Amino acid sequence: MASQSDIVKELQVAYWMEMETVMNYVANSINLDGVRAEEIKKSLAADVTAELGHAQVLAKRIKTIGGVVEGSMKFNAGQKELQPPAKLTDVVAIIKGVIAAEDSAITQYNKLIKLCDGVDYVTQDLCIQALA
């Protein structure tokens, strides 16, 4: 059975994943060049708000269940695939990076859903809603 500290730890992982996605979406929504990039840039810029909203929900839950929302010194980047490409017209690289980031988030939320089962139904429901 998972402890509250186990749940907080995994919520923090999910929180940082969302925050990193925000940073990379902002960077790529600005940096991409070319006619083919315009729709991707618009989509990424629009998704920043949703991803930041996910991070805020996670942060509130961390605090609610007794954790502390970490500051930037605790951040460890991990989204190699979503970094701005060397060739700023490489839209495909960004699309692949978005897919990789979303796959990682889905995996983390599923991990939390299993971890919370029978222990913390509110956090479990929050994670289920994030996947909806």
Annotate each predicted stretch with a short phrase:
Residues 7-17, 21-28, 60-61, 79-132:
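Acidic/histidine-rich alpha-helical segments that form the ligand environment
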Residues 1-5:
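Basic/polar N-terminal segments that are highly enriched at the extreme N-terminus
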Residues 32-75:
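Conserved alpha-helical segments that form or flank metal/cofactor-binding pockets of metalloenzymes
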